[in-house]
């Protein structure tokens, strides 16, 4: 599963500058996906859902069944919230149920109007997911969410002022699962311990994940756990993709979910890609990852098709 949230080029910086220039970088990424028969899921925000260039570009791939288009809610760009939030990057989990449902309904309607499809896949902006959102997703026809980042605690990440930060996912599963009393499938981003203790959803994983961040946890991680995100970071290398693949195979995971922001695919639009050289490095690692996964027999599928199957 390849999940790509296309969005603003300047949202990594302070200010309210709105630019979708990084969307123009997506054809190169799409071409790489098609080279390895992988089907990306583009989870889009309100500003992308109403942009004519983005609609034309993504609709073409969607209509050819080479990509899926789903929803990605950023409260600070939602028409019903933008004036009140004034650029404050609150987590969707910090909204009331009424605020969240209105914002997601508007986004869903915009996608349906522009792309002539009803979106069924979703990710909360900034990983800001909570139980309140599950029933709303179901009411609006969504069948799959990918907002959970297992092993990660976002409570120290600032969202709403004078609030408690983001969600704590450390106790949640790595494998896909259904929320209780719900038909919405959760497909977490693949974050694995690839060291000595690599059993997925096992006792040691849960125990270590619950440890407070600090020097001791960093030492244990380096020696025994070696946590790896299925994302491209400046320090990523071929060995990371091999470790992730080996751990996934050993644990019989049904899926590996990778994600990248569209802003990380163009120069000067992300802290990870400040220069053209850094963009080329990202693409080298993407090529390495896709090649390793493809040679191992992994087959690409969109989020919603995975949920249906």
Model-found features: residue ranges?
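Active-site beta->alpha N-cap acidic-glycine motif
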Residues: 1-63, 289
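Surface-exposed, active-site-proximal loop segments in enzymatic domains
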Residues: 4-14, 82-94, 268-274
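Acidic-and-aromatic substrate-binding clefts and catalytic sites of carbohydrate-active enzymes
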Residues: 17-23, 43-55, 123-131, 154, ...
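Acidic (Asp/Glu)-rich catalytic clusters
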Residues: 27-37, 50-78, 138, 243-253
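Hydrophobic faces of well-ordered beta-strands that scaffold small-molecule active sites
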Residues: 40-42, 69-73, 120-122, 144-146, ...
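Metal-dependent polysaccharide deacetylase catalytic core of the NodB/CE4 family, i.e.
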Residues: 43-124, 128, 191-196, 262-263
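Active-site-adjacent pocket scaffolds in enzyme catalytic domains
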Residues: 124-249
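C-terminal domain-boundary segment and adjacent tail
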Residues: 215-309
């Amino acid at each position: 599963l390849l999940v790509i949230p296309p969005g603003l080029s300047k949202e990594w910086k302070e200010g309210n500058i709105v630019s979708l220039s990084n969307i123009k970088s997506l054809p190169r990424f799409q071409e790489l996906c098609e080279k390895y028969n992988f089907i990306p899921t583009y989870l889009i925000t309100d500003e992308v859902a109403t942009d004519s260039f983005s609609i034309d570009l993504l609709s073409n791939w969607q209509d050819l069944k080479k990509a899926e288009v789903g929803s990605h809610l950023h409260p600070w760009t939602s028409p019903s919230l933008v004036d009140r939030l004034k650029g404050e990057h609150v987590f969707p989990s910090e909204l009331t149920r009424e605020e969240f449902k209105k914002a997601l309904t508007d986004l869903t309607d915009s996608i349906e109007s522009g792309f002539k499809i009803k979106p069924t896949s979703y990710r909360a902006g900034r990983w800001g997911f909570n139980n309140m959102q599950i029933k709303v997703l179901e009411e609006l026809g969504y069948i799959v969410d990918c907002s959970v980042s297992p092993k990660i605690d976002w409570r120290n990440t600032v969202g709403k002022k004078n609030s408690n930060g983001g969600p704590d996912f450390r106790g949640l599963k790595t494998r896909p699962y259904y929320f209780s009393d719900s038909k919405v499938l959760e497909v977490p981003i693949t974050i694995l311990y690839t060291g000595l203790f690599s059993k997925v959803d096992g006792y040691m994983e849960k125990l270590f994940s619950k440890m407070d961040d600090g020097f001791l946890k960093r030492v244990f991680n380096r020696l025994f756990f070696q946590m790896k995100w299925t994302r491209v970071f400046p320090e990523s290398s071929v060995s990371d993709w091999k470790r992730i693949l080996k751990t996934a195979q050993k644990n019989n995971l049904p899926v590996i979910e990778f994600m990248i922001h569209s802003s990380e695919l163009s120069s000067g639009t992300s802290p990870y890609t400040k220069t053209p050289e850094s963009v080329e490095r990202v693409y080298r690692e993407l090529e390495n990852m896709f090649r390793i996964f493809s040679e191992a027999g992994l087959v690409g599928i969109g989020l919603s098709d995975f949920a249906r199957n």
